[in-house]
């Protein structure tokens, strides 16, 4: 019985191998040549565009029959509009942008995201002068700050700005980008109102009732 079972299993495995090989050949034939060989890809000068730069320098695009031009863009909106209008064939862009286009939050369009270039790693940073004011409110261990640092440590600083009649400004890359969401979550969790959007009232600034003002600053700046 064991010998017979072994023979049956071997036959099944051989047939599976044959079927997989056939499927692979069929899929390869179905793909065919590139529909367009010359491509212009936009990018913002950030480290997460590195896969595109490496592929360009190492000749990986040409290995696939593609002749790619990489073109730096001044900000995310220019890049996004370039993809929508067809000026760019593709681009390194913020992960929520295709979702925003599909749902009509921005310009309504079908944007396909075939590849993820990064894991959305990010950090919240403050100016040295702001950190000096925050530091007394931050827990320390062996002379080093205990992470994660809550925005509660920033709250007294924001309050001192308010009393002095000065706005407390924070920058983020794009309204629909994860940077905006993460900053707002961090501030709110620490007791600082980040403001809210009120499109029904014609206010898309995201600063209604804000204690800290978030504004768009393109990455190159």
Q: Where do the model's predicted regions map?
A:
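Short, low-complexity disordered leader/linker segments with a strong preference
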Residues: 1-36
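Short, glycine-/small- and polar/acidic-enriched structural segments
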Residues: 30-215
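Pocket-lining segment of extracytoplasmic ligand-binding domains
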Residues: 219-221
């Amino acid at each position: 019985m064991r010998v017979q079972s072994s023979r049956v299993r071997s036959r099944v495995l051989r047939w599976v191998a044959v079927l997989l090989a056939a499927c692979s050949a069929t899929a390869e034939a179905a793909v065919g040549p590139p529909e367009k060989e010359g491509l212009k890809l936009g990018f913002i000068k950030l480290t997460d565009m590195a896969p595109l730069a490496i592929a360009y320098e190492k000749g990986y695009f040409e290995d696939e029959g593609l002749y790619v031009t990489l073109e730096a863009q001044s900000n995310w909106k220019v890049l996004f509009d370039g993809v929508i209008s067809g000026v760019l064939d593709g681009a390194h862009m913020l992960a929520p942008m295709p979702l925003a286009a599909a749902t009509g939050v921005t310009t309504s369009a079908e944007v396909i995201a075939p590849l993820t270039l990064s894991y959305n790693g990010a950090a919240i940073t403050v100016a040295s002068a702001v950190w000096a004011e925050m530091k007394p409110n931050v827990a320390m261990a062996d002379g080093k700050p205990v992470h994660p640092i809550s925005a509660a440590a920033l709250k007294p600083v924001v309050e001192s700005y308010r009393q002095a009649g000065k706005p407390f400004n924070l920058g983020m890359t794009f309204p629909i980008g994860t940077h905006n969401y993460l900053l707002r979550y961090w501030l709110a969790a620490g007791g600082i109102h980040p403001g809210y959007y009120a499109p029904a009232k014609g206010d898309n600034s995201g600063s209604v009732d804000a204690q800290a003002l978030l504004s768009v600053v393109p990455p190159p700046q």
